[in-house]
Swiss-Prot record:
Pfam families: OSCP
Protein encoded by which gene: atpH
Protein name: ATP synthase subunit delta
Entry GO CC: plasma membrane; proton-transporting ATP synthase complex
Membrane topology category: Peripheral membrane protein
PROSITE patterns cross-referenced by the UniProt entry: ATPASE_DELTA
Lineage: Bacteria, Bacillati, Bacillota, Bacilli, Lactobacillales
Species: Lactiplantibacillus plantarum (strain ATCC BAA-793 / NCIMB 8826 / WCFS1) (Lactobacillus plantarum)
């Protein structure tokens, strides 16, 4: 019975996160894992090469050693285990799941803010602080998007929730109220 990618990512990230907490190394593990993830994102064929039969085992091991050259022993062992169990293609998903666990443990929320004009850093910081207070987060990491169609105000999306404070929505609601009355 094969496991789906989400289950694999969840199990491996949970085990690694528990080790990171035990060793008080969550930030260090995350930093190392993010670097490795970026290598695999930038080189999508790398996981296939390490999983496939194109390269001899000794060349794969050399590649793994090069990849983890500056990593801690824990991360080296983790990557070696993924290789040994044929899970290199799951590395990006595992790191994503590890980062989600890290964020959850620190009450860090990622959100996208849409505005009609480009927000200044001060405006974005104010929105992040207000949103953090509203959702009970310690920190909000905002990505910004401009959409002139909202006319004014902002729309903040996070974790399948949308907080719409746009002028476009207010006009739509006003129009509906006028039509219904």
């Amino acid at each position: 019975m094969s496991l789906d990618n989400l289950t694999i990512a969840s199990r491996y990230s949970k085990a690694l996160f528990e080790l990171a907490v035990e060793k008080d190394q969550t930030e260090a593990f995350l930093a190392e894992l993010k670097q490795l993830r970026q290598v695999f994102v930038d080189n999508p064929q790398l996981a296939e090469v390490l999983s496939g039969s194109l390269l001899p085992v000794d060349q794969k091991q050399t590649t793994l050693s090069t990849l983890t050259d500056h990593a801690s022993e824990y991360i080296k062992n983790f990557i070696q285990m993924l290789y040994d169990y044929g899970r290199m293609s799951n590395l990006v998903g595992i790191v994503d799941a590890f980062e989600a666990r890290f964020d959850e443990s620190r009450k860090i929320v990622h959100a996208e803010v849409t505005s009609a004009v480009k927000l200044s850093d001060e405006q974005a910081d104010a929105i992040a602080k207000a949103f953090a207070k509203r959702v009970g987060a310690n920190q909000v990491v905002l990505s910004r998007k401009v959409d002139e169609a909202i006319i004014g105000g902002v729309i903040v999306k996070s974790n399948n929730q949308t907080f719409d404070g746009s002028v476009a929505l207010q006009l739509t609601n006003l129009r509906r109220a006028l039509i219904n009355n």
